[in-house]
A protein has these predicted regions:
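Cytoplasmic juxtamembrane interface segments
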Residues: 1-10, 74-99
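Alpha-helical transmembrane segments and their helix-start/interface "positive-inside/aromatic belt" motifs
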Residues: 3-23, 95-105, 158-162
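Hydrophobic alpha-helical membrane-insertion segments
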Residues: 21-32, 100-117
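Membrane-helix interface motif
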Residues: 32-47, 117-127
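Perimembrane loop-to-helix junctions flanking transmembrane segments
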Residues: 41-62, 130-137
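Alpha-helical transmembrane segments and their immediate interhelical/interface regions
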Residues: 55-84
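Hydrophobic cores of alpha-helical transmembrane segments in multi-pass inner/ER membrane proteins
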Residues: 78-79, 151-160
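Individual transmembrane alpha-helices with interfacial aromatic-anchor signatures
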Residues: 137-151
Length: 166
């Protein structure tokens, strides 16, 4: 009666959904923490400006910046999850196809990491270079269109992770 073999196995679909949910939570936390630390530097640079910028525009720019870093955090955690799944599969099967997938995932991972650094660099440099022209600090390249692209990337990686874990 106490021996139920099916109770010890988790359904692969459930396992995939739980893993994706956990990776999203971890990605949100990572992106938010990175944004908190990098925004301190950006706000310090912003406070050095000789002009006064509308606080509403600053808040909007901070929200765009934080949202972009959260999206990148989710992408990074999904890519780590995919790398784990494909590396595990490669170790079991020794398939050359999985080597190619791992290389592709590593390239996307490096792109996402560099995007985090470039977002911070763009924001800092933009404050220093053109404070009088823009009157805000994150206008170039930071708008709703970025979040559409990030959303599609996250959905695509989530689907790939789900199908790979199933």
């Amino acid at each position: 009666m106490g021996d139920m073999p099916y109770s010890k196995k988790i359904n692969p679909k459930t396992k995939a959904i739980v893993a994706i949910f956990v990776l999203v939570i971890i990605g949100v936390i990572i992106g938010y923490v990175i944004s908190i630390f990098s925004l301190e530097i950006i706000i310090t640079e912003l406070n050095k400006l000789p002009i006064q910028i509308n606080p509403v525009r600053i808040d909007r720019s901070i929200n765009y910046y934080t949202g972009a870093l959260i999206c990148l955090g989710i992408e990074i955690t999904f890519l780590i999850g995919l790398l784990y799944v494909y590396t595990d599969s490669f170790l079991k099967t020794k398939s050359r196809f999985l080597i190619g997938l791992n290389m592709f995932i590593i390239a996307l991972f490096i792109k996402s990491l560099l995007s985090v650094f470039s977002l911070h660099s763009i924001a800092n440099d933009y404050i220093r270079v053109s404070p009088y022209v823009s009157r805000t600090f994150l206008t170039p390249g930071f708008n709703e269109l970025n979040f559409v692209v990030y959303t599609f990337e996250i959905i695509a990686l989530g689907i790939l992770l789900y199908l790979s874990m199933e």
